[in-house]
Amino acid sequence: VLFGETGVAQHLKPGTAVMVSSTIASADAQEIATALAGFDLEMLDAPVSGGAVKAANGEMTVMASGSDIAFERLAPVLEAVAGKVYRIGAEPGLGSTVKIIHQLLAGVHIAAGAEAMALAARAGIPLDVMYDVVTNAAGNSWMFENRMRHVVDGDYTPHSAVDIFVKDLGLVADTAKALHFPLPLASTALKMFTSASNA
């Protein structure tokens, strides 16, 4: 979309700030920023979180890094889409790194939530009771509350793709590998999502 023969970067006015909100590797964010700089364009590395409802209501959480100029020029966009904007730093890639670490938690929470509900079912605990206990106790998380509600309701309509977490937890694994940092829980969650994707 941005580069190549039909890319928009070559048509943007010099000094324009471009907001990149995809969940991508830090190195990819840095490469995009460098390529945009070649067109005299600013980049805000600004991944988002919050789901479809928060997106529709302009209440996303944005994890952004970039220059003061990029933040200033994109302030109206950030105001329109975000309930909360975190300024992570000036270097592109920092926002992406925070999002990747966030996705570690999101993926592990979904996997652990599914495992807990499966164990409850095997133990004969009514799923609505288990859900109510967890959502009113210390073990709750936004992901449990959001995703396990569908399990309780017997709603197996796809609301998002399993492969999103195969990709995102893959980014988590790549980030950890580059930093020589072990992540046994995230690795297990990635295996679970990969198995689900191949089912």
Spans of model-derived segments:
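Interdomain hinge/lid region at the active-site interface
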Residues: 96, 105, 140-199
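Active-site-proximal catalytic alpha-helix in oxidoreductases
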Residues: 57-65, 86, 92-123, 132-146, ...
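Helix N-cap / loop-to-helix initiation motif
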Residues: 25, 124-127, 182
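Glycine-rich, highly charged phosphate/nucleotide-binding loops
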Residues: 1-7
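Beta-strand segments within the central parallel beta-sheet cores of soluble alpha/beta enzyme folds
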Residues: 128-136, 187-191
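Rossmann-fold dinucleotide-binding core
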Residues: 4, 14-18, 23-103, 107
